[in-house]
């Protein structure tokens, strides 16, 4: 919508162009002008361009005003009054509400303030000009002229200079400048503007004359003249209480009003009528071009034309054509009704049958609305149950930021109320922008981004559920407690078979009843391991190495520091750390749980771990079990302690190395020889051992036993066995000397028994010289013989594919079988792999936290004795041994 000033100026310019176009059209075609003796207009035509009275002898001007009709106001006022132009009245002169002229707001030439549409229009008609300037209207609020023939009618706004001339004709006492019948001088009509509304808007009772679309004039009655009525301010002191508003949507409906005037509204139009009664009566004897009304007579229908466009349409139709019905009102332009400041009549003059007032928008109201601030929207309560922290007072509202729904930022769907679902991002497409609360920053403060690393399936969780304790995250934590509860129930049921205390003690001993050890290691230990590992940070910050991998065993290490636990827990930790067979952190954690069961301190350790807030914040994420149990869900910690409480009553004697003895990994279980090997493998092993003995004897030069044992290995190993394949493969390696042995390379093998080989060997065996034994060793590819390098026998050999292996099976057989290692030596076997000369350099000063650890200073060289696991080394310094953290040392190459 345009500003009020521009809208008023555009409307005046539009009226000005209509005046100019109509004047040019009439000046070029004089035949369109209506003469005095022309055919009278049809009864339905209420345009009333001229009257049949005394002014019917001359042509009319562009406003259909006859120059013969004198201006009643020209005799009294002088040139000073005529030359005055009131800009305030011109400001208040509004555009007509007629649809024909209200649908265009096109840009046109500006209308200067000193040129009214009438004055410009009158210049386009040559020959009708007069020396007298255009009379001006009275100023708003000025005192009215005295009653008499010289009183200036408000209709003089639209009169031409010709009609206002006093030379044309003598003034008539009952006609104004537009040939309109005037009332007595005591009556001053206060015309106004009426806007027609097809939709039935409220009608405000203002000072305006009635307007009808199809005003019908009876044949016997005089034609009413047309008037273009500006809007005048109402002088409430001069008017009596004669206001009346009539709303009628029925065509043909007649309403009787006051005795002084009456109106007729037709064709479904809403009209408001102003009846002004200043104590005068209508002259019934003078009916030329005016109204005819009497108290007892039928009211004459009157039509007031307020549109120049309607006048132009009537002139173009001609006198014989019917009136073109008005087009449907264009509601898009004339939504502003131009009305004076005094819009309402006096409150005491309103009748009882008033229609509801019409909504009238003035420039004054528009200015007040634009200056007024919009009413504050009442804040709405945010959806309940959104986060773990209470909502804070919101900062100044900002427009909410729309985000895409990502899989990593989905809210928890279970347990949400209807408000929570409407406000959650998943339901964002159902909730419109008008339903969002005015303080969106309250949710932005609550939605803290927590890391869910290490929690399975937690990448789909973007916010903890609510204070009520329901949600997928808490259901996951309850699942950990369910596993602990199931394992405790199985252990209690195992002890339920005992009849007395002695049987209970026997059922709790892993040496007497291994079932209890298996039950604890397969059910309780994995459940507690998963519970401690839940929400654990993957790495811990370290001063030297930067970060160290976290595990449940690192939680045990941090929880048993001096001053943070009892002495018994510290000694148990030292005992488990010294167990060399426990190489993994999981096996150490399981052994620690077994030790806590033996000392009945399992519940106590979990309770002390839960109370250490600094340790939990250092090791765990906010979504971990212990973090939630200490923060928002203390019921989880209480339930865990209640589940572990029955185990403190039972008596356990569990071996800390029970897992090492009974639950070895699959690779270690295959290392010892099977109890029942297959027969082919037994024969192969027997043949290897027997042949090794014979070969050793032959190399030593003893031949007495060869004949005695010649019949022993008569049983040849079956074809396809491991020993047969090894025998065939050994024939590939042949000596290149001059002994005359044929060179056989992956050809058909001559399968002979060891007895045949013994028959080939009598000549060398009879000679007890050491050279013969060297030859036999060289026959089987045994390296290290001094005669090979001296005689250069290997010079004629083929390339590397024919070279014998550096270490062969026969060379190992020559060395003999090592003595069996006692079982006690298996405990210290990992340390034997480490070389004795390995050393590490200390990177920092370290004080031993336990009796099994080694204290050292920065830069010292420590001798590595054994590798305990990936985190600890057993080192020695100055005859003192102990455990050293791997992260505090660097290997010396």
UniProtKB/Swiss-Prot annotation:
Q: Which residue intervals define the domain RUN in the entry?
A: 515-659
Q: Where in the cell is it found?
A: Cytoplasm; Nucleus; Cytoplasm, Cytoskeleton; Cytoplasmic vesicle
Composition bias, Basic and acidic residues: 237-257
User: Which residues does the annotated region (Disordered) include?
Assistant: 31-223, 237-332, 339-358, 366-444, 700-721, 751-772
Compositional bias, Polar residues, is annotated for 77-87, 177-187
Domain (SH3) ranges: 835-893
CDD domains of this UniProt entry?
RUN_RUSC1 (cd17701)
One Pfam assignment: SH3_9
PTM description: Phosphorylated on serine residues following nuclear translocation. Polyubiquitinated; polyubiquitination involves TRAF6.
Q: Which GO terms describe its cellular component?
A: cytoplasmic vesicle; cytosol; early endosome; Golgi apparatus; microtubule; microtubule cytoskeleton; nucleus; postsynaptic density
Task of the protein: Associates with the adapter-like complex 4 (AP-4) and may therefore play a role in vesicular trafficking of proteins at the trans-Golgi network. Signaling adapter which plays a role in neuronal differentiation. Involved in regulation of NGF-dependent neurite outgrowth. May play a role in neuronal vesicular trafficking, specifically involving pre-synaptic membrane proteins. Seems to be involved in signaling pathways that are regulated by the prolonged activation of MAPK. Can regulate the polyubiquitination of IKBKG and thus may be involved in regulation of the NF-kappa-B pathway.
Q: What is known of its domains?
A: The RUN domain is necessary for NGF induced nuclear redistribution.
Q: What is this protein called?
A: AP-4 complex accessory subunit RUSC1
Q: Which organism is it from?
A: Mus musculus (Mouse)
């Amino acid at each position: 919508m345009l500003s009020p000033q521009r809208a008023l100026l555009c409307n005046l310019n539009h009226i000005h162009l209509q005046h100019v176009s109509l004047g040019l059209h009439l000046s070029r075609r004089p035949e369109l002008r209506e003469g005095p003796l022309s055919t009278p207009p049809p009864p339905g035509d209420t345009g009333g361009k001229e009257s049949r009275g005394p002014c019917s002898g001359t042509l009319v001007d562009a406003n259909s005003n006859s120059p013969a009709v004198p201006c009643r106001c020209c005799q009294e006022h002088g040139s000073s009054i005529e030359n005055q132009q009131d800009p305030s009245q011109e400001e208040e002169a509004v555009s007509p509400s007629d649809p024909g002229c209200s649908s265009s707001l096109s840009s046109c030439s500006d209308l200067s303030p000193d040129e009214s549409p009438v004055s410009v229009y009158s210049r386009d008609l040559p020959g009708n000009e007069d020396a007298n300037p255009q009379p001006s209207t009275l100023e708003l609020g000025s005192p009215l002229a005295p009653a008499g023939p010289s009183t200036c009618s408000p209709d003089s706004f639209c009169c031409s200079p010709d009609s206002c001339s006093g030379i044309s004709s003598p003034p008539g006492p009952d006609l104004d400048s537009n040939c309109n019948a005037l009332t007595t001088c005591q009556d001053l009509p206060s015309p106004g503007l009426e806007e027609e509304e097809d939709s039935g808007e409220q009608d405000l009772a203002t000072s305006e004359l009635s307007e009808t679309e199809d005003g019908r004039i009876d044949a016997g009655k005089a034609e009413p003249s047309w008037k273009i009525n500006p809007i005048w301010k109402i002088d409430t002191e001069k008017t009596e209480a004669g206001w009346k508003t009539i709303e009628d949507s029925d065509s043909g409906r007649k309403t009787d009003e006051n005795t002084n005037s009456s109106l007729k509204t037709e064709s479904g139009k809403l009209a408001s009528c102003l009846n002004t009664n200043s104590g005068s009566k209508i002259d019934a004897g003078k009916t030329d071009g005016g109204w005819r009304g009497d108290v007892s007579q039928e009211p004459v229908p009157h039509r007031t034309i307020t549109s120049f466009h309607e006048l132009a349409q009537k002139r173009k139709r001609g006198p014989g054509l019917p009136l073109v019905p008005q087009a449907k009102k264009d509601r898009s332009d004339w939504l502003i009704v131009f009305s004076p400041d005094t819009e309402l009549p006096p409150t005491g003059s309103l009748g009882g049958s008033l229609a509801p007032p019409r909504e009238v928008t003035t420039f004054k109201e528009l200015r007040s609305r634009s200056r007024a601030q919009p009413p504050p929207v009442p804040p709405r309560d945010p959806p309940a149950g959104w986060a773990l922290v209470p909502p804070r007072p919101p900062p100044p509202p900002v427009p909410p930021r729309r985000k895409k729904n990502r899989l990593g930022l989905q809210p928890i769907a279970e347990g949400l109320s209807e408000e929570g679902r409407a406000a959650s991002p998943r339901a964002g497409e159902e909730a419109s922008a008008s339903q969002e609360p005015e303080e969106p920053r309250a949710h932005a403060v609550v939605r803290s981004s927590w890391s869910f690393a290490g929690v399975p399936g937690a990448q789909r969780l973007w916010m903890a559920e609510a204070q009520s304790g329901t949600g997928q995250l808490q259901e996951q934590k309850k699942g950990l407690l369910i596993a602990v509860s199931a394992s405790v129930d199985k252990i209690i049921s195992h002890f339920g078979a005992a009849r007395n205390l002695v049987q209970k003690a026997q059922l709790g001993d892993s040496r007497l009843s291994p079932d209890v050890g298996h039950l604890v290691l397969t059910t309780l230990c994995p459940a507690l391991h998963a519970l401690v590992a839940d929400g654990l940070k993957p790495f811990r910050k370290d001063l030297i190495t930067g970060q160290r991998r976290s595990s449940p065993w690192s939680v045990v290490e941090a929880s048993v520091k001096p001053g943070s636990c009892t002495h018994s827990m510290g000694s148990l930790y030292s005992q488990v750390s010294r167990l060399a067979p426990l190489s993994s952190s999981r096996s150490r954690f399981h052994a620690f749980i077994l030790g806590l069961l033996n000392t009945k301190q399992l519940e106590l350790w979990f309770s002390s771990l839960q109370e250490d807030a600094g340790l939990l914040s250092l090791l765990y994420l906010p979504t971990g079990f212990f973090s939630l149990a200490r923060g928002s869900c203390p019921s989880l910690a209480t339930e865990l302690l209640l589940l572990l409480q029955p185990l403190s009553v039972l008596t356990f004697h569990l071996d800390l190395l029970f897992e090492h003895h009974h639950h070895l990994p699959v690779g270690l279980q295959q290392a010892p020889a099977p109890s029942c090997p297959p027969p082919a493998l037994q024969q192969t092993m027997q043949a290897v051992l027997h042949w090794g003995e014979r070969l050793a004897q032959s190399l030593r030069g003893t031949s007495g036993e060869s004949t005695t044992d010649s019949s022993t290995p008569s049983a040849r190993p079956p074809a396809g066995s491991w020993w047969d394949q090894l025998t065939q493969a050994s024939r590939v390696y042949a000596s290149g000397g001059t002994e005359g042995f044929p060179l056989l390379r992956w050809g058909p093998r001559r399968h002979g028994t060891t007895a045949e080989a013994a028959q080939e060997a009598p000549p060398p065996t009879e000679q007890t010289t050491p050279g013969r034994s060297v030859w036999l060793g060289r026959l089987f590819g045994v390296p290290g013989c001094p005669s090979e390098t001296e005689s250069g026998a290997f010079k004629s050999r083929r390339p590397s594919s024919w070279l014998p292996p550096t270490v062969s099976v026969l060379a190992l057989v020559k060395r003999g079988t090592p003595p069996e290692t006692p079982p006690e030596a298996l405990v210290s076997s990992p340390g034997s792999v480490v070389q004795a000369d390995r050393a590490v350099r200390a990177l920092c000063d370290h004080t031993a936290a336990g009796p099994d650890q080694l204290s050292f200073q920065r830069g010292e060289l420590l001798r590595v004795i054994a590798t305990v696991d990936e985190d600890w080394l057993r080192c020695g310094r100055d005859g003192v041994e102990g455990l050293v953290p791997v992260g505090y040392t660097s290997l010396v190459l």
